Amino acid sequence: MENRLRESTIINKRYVFDLKVTPYFKHKKMCEIQTSDIRAWQNELIKKGYAPTYLKSINNQLAALFNYAVRYYDLRDNPCRKAGSIGKSKADEMDFWTKQEFKEFLPSMDSKPEARMAFLLLYWTGMRIGELLALTYEDIDLEKRCITINKSYQRLNGKDMITPPKTPKSNRKISIPPFLVEELKEYCSMLYGI
């Protein structure tokens, strides 16, 4: 199964099991875990105040493990199925800055040119933070007014890594408005003396 998943996905799944699942069920074999145990575990997670989408993700990972054991190791049934799910699969709609809110915020970054440029790029292009952190000068075409997104930054096991995008659709070219081209020229000139 591991060869089908990205390294970051494997690390995240291990993290969830090591911190959220194993400590609670470490004294029981899978075949000893009952629906009531799952419900008690779910209630403990809910008390911790995790986001509904995170609760759903944790619950789904344990349910998937039980499904795997039912399918391939003759476990009689999946207690997660009987216990039902927790959380929700869709996050609440994101709250974006209005243009006015962004204009009011931006001057607070005037003494921090790197942060100012980062916020400008994030706001006006919609790129993800990992995509921004992986950008190189070669990804920016000031003449054609576009930025090529073809990689992402991640921190895996304490190491900085540049990885391919999560999906093929994440590879894209983003058009940038003329004023942002001018901001980028000024910023690159400051950095590289160009």
Task: Identify the function of each model-found stretch.
Residues 33, 97, 175-176:
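A conserved hydrophobic position in a structured secondary element of the catalytic/binding core
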Residues 15-19, 40, 60, 64, ...:
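Generic recognition of well-ordered alpha-helical segments
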Residues 52, 56-58, 71, 75-135, ...:
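Basic, Lys/Arg- and aromatic-enriched nucleic-acid-binding interface segment
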Residues 1-76, 91:
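N-terminal core-binding DNA-recognition domain of tyrosine site-specific recombinases/integrases
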